[in-house]
Regions:
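Short intrinsically disordered terminal tails
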Residues: 1-2, 167-170
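Long, low-complexity or tandemly repetitive, helically biased scaffold regions used
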Residues: 9, 16-154
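Class I SAM-dependent methyltransferase "Motif I" SAM/SAH-binding loop
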Residues: 157
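Conserved S-adenosyl-L-methionine
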Residues: 161-166
Length: 170
């Protein structure tokens, strides 16, 4: 049977490259679970996994629909938010020590807030440049403001969706 470090390292590598991989069933770890060298290696695995996830998410920004179609943008926006929710699941994983979780959550709050601001800025610039019809641009901007990326920072984000899915499966 694999030890906790191997289990976490394998799960993080898989999670970083496979959007369907989960972090469920990982053993809890504490700051004392490993010697300092192994602890640093595990932190590197976490950092690498988050970096890959962030890069993949940033690539979605390049796929920002350059269209006046509100519904296409809405679908893209909700998918984008759900991808960030996956990142938050790692940052807030109950198996991580409080110190690590606190640091990851603080970093996530800053990054996601910055991304929200960046997207709002893009939409404001496109409106000024006249790339979107005024009414559609306003609806898209309102959507981004009323359903912000920062919603994923709430630990209960997605709970209702998961419950609904579970009920539909039963």
């Amino acid at each position: 049977m694999a030890n906790a470090y191997e289990t976490w390292a394998r799960a993080l590598r898989s999670w970083a490259t496979d959007p369907t991989a989960t972090l469920d069933d990982l053993p809890p770890i504490t700051a004392e679970s490993f010697n300092p060298t192994v602890h640093r290696r595990l932190l590197k695995h976490i950092e690498r996994a988050l970096s890959i996830a962030d890069n993949r998410w940033s690539e979605t920004l390049t796929n920002l629909p350059a269209t006046a179609d509100y519904h296409e943008f809405e679908r893209w926006w909700l998918t984008t938010r759900n991808n960030l929710a996956r990142r938050m699941h790692l940052c807030n994983h109950p198996g991580l020590p409080d110190e690590i979780r606190s640091t990851l959550l603080s970093d996530a709050q800053t990054r996601i807030g910055n991304w929200q601001h960046h997207i709002e800025s893009i939409l404001r610039r496109s409106s000024v440049a006249g790339e979107l019809p005024t009414a559609t641009e306003q609806r898209i901007y309102d959507l981004v403001r009323s359903t912000p990326l920062t919603a994923v920072l709430d630990p209960t984000y997605g709970t209702a969706t998961r419950l609904t899915h579970a009920l539909e499966q039963s």
